[in-house]
Regions:
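Short N-proximal segments of mature Sec-exported proteins
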Residues: 22-86
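Bacterial N-terminal signal peptides that target proteins for export
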Residues: 1-7
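Short, compact, well-ordered microdomains
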Residues: 86-123
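N-terminal leader/targeting signatures
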Residues: 9-11, 87
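Cleavable N-terminal signal peptides
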Residues: 8-9, 19-20
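N-terminal signal peptide c-region/cleavage motif recognized by signal peptidases
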Residues: 14-18
């Protein structure tokens, strides 16, 4: 009985959350970099809103990295989410002009691809 109610409610919640996110969030390379800067400060020093932004940054990077890994574009089973976040953040920091040139997904793909490409790791 509970599962018959729970599944539609969860699906509705997921759908409504994604629609809301699409309508209210405008993420670009600079806002992605801002998330990295907050992540770098450490969660002990952030207010709730900044903590959410830092978590969003880490989650975004983890999602892109997970997708690239599943498609065998990047390879490194021992890397942590924090290391992936650092790779993308360092790229954003050292390439400020790229932040407005590419989408956040493209920026993360470029950064992770440069450091963790399967072909690069197999030649080492």
């Amino acid at each position: 009985m509970i599962s018959k109610i729970t599944i539609p409610v969860v699906l509705l919640f997921c759908f409504s959350t994604s629609v809301l996110a699409k309508s209210t969030l405008n993420i670009d390379g600079n806002s992605l970099y801002h998330g990295y800067q907050l992540y770098e400060k450490g969660f002990d020093y952030l207010n709730v809103r900044d903590e959410q932004t830092a978590v969003m940054y880490m989650s975004f990077v983890a999602g892109v990295a997970g997708t690239l890994s599943k498609e065998n574009i990047i390879c490194n089973e021992s890397i942590t989410i924090g290391q992936e976040a650092d790779i993308v953040g360092n790229f954003l920091q050292t390439h400020p002009k790229e932040r407005t040139k590419y989408s956040p997904s493209e920026l993360a793909m470029i950064a992770l691809g440069k450091e963790l490409a399967c072909s690069k790791n197999s030649n080492s």
